[in-house]
């Protein structure tokens, strides 16, 4: 059987049907499904980064399931249905691409993005009572991403360095403040945490100035570290040893060897 999107919507509705539906699905609500939504989103990202196209197909389906499930919850509460979600996003795509569906012109991607932002700004006029340039930056965003967005918003009104040098200086300053905290006779953990936070925030600003997405950069660094450490583990096992029994100096040598092989 070949399922359509309407068939799929009905499948999810049946899962939520009090008469014969699934007990687990019936117990779920908006809040309980947040972790599922987050997990499925990151699994899509992982499939893309691994260039695992067959798995990407599956993970996109799982992500679609989340969208339809949340829409079903909203339909039950008489807020909106999946068709409304689809209608809204289709209208938005048409509205924000006047250079495709209208008479506006966009010669390159910069102009196209400018058209998008112009339409987005028009939509917001009179729609909400914003009191700050920082309004509507979702607090649920990953912290690195949210930091970059906050900084970008401030940059739009001139609260930003134009040169890269003071950005580097700020990172050094925050690093020194971390060092000062841990050099105290009595270390206050909350103070250390605060200074580490400031250091991370300054580092995100450096990444932004260098046109790097901090979340992507850290994710790739995680993958690189994982790949290299797995190689170290394998090298240790080939020597008939266990990693936890190998001195750090030997592990460092193996690590350096792995790095050389990669480079």
Curated annotation (Swiss-Prot):
Any GO MF annotation of the entry: ATP binding
UniProt cofactor(s): Mg(2+)
Pfam families, per database record: MazG
Binding residues for ATP 1: 170-174, 177, 191-194, 198
Record's catalysed reaction(s): ATP + H2O = AMP + diphosphate + H(+)
Assigned EC number: 3.6.1.8
Key words, A-Z: ATP-binding, Hydrolase, Magnesium, Metal-binding, Nucleotide-binding
Amino-acid positions noted as binding ATP 2 in the UniProt annotation, renumbered to this chain: 224-228, 255
InterPro entries membership: MazG-like_dom, NTP-PPase_MazG-like_C, NTP-PPase_MazG-like_N, NTP_PyrPHydrolase_MazG
Gene3D superfamilies: MazG-like (1.10.287.1080)
Oligomeric and partner information: Homodimer.
Family: Belongs to the nucleoside triphosphate pyrophosphohydrolase family.
The protein's role, per its UniProt record: Involved in the regulation of bacterial cell survival under conditions of nutritional stress. Regulates the MazE-MazF toxin-antitoxin (TA) system that mediates programmed cell death (PCD). This is achieved by lowering the cellular concentration of (p)ppGpp produced by RelA under amino acid starvation, thus protecting the cell from the toxicity of MazF. Reduction of (p)ppGpp can be achieved by direct degradation of (p)ppGpp or by degradation of NTPs, which are substrates for (p)ppGpp synthesis by RelA.
Name of protein: Nucleoside triphosphate pyrophosphohydrolase
UniProt organism field: Haemophilus influenzae (strain ATCC 51907 / DSM 11121 / KW20 / Rd)
């Amino acid at each position: 059987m070949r399922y359509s999107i309407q068939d799929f919507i009905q499948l999810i509705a049946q899962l939520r049907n009090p008469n014969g539906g699934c007990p687990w699905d019936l117990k779920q609500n908006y809040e309980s499904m947040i972790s599922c939504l987050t997990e499925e989103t990151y699994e899509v990202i992982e499939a893309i980064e691994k260039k695992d196209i067959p798995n990407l197909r599956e993970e996109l389906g799982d992500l679609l399931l989340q969208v339809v499930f949340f829409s079903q919850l909203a339909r039950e509460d008489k807020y909106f249905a999946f068709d409304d979600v689809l209608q809204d996003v289709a209208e938005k795509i048409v509205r924000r691409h006047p250079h495709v569906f209208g008479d506006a012109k966009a010669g390159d991607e910069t102009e196209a993005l400018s058209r998008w932002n112009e339409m987005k700004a028009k939509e917001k006029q009179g729609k909400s009572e914003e009191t700050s340039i920082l309004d509507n930056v979702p607090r649920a965003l990953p912290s690195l991403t949210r930091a970059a967005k906050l900084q970008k918003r401030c940059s739009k009104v001139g609260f930003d360095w134009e040169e890269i040098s003071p950005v580097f200086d700020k990172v050094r300053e925050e690093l020194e403040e971390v060092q000062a905290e841990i050099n105290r006779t009595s270390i206050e953990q909350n103070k250390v945490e605060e200074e580490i936070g400031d250091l991370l925030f300054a580092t995100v600003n450096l990444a932004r100035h260098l046109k790097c997405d901090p979340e992507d950069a850290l994710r790739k660094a995680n993958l690189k570290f994982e790949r290299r450490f797995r190689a170290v583990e394998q090298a240790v096992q080939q020597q008939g040893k266990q990693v936890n029994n190998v001195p750090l100096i030997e592990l460092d040598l193996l690590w350096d060897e792995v790095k050389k092989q990669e480079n």
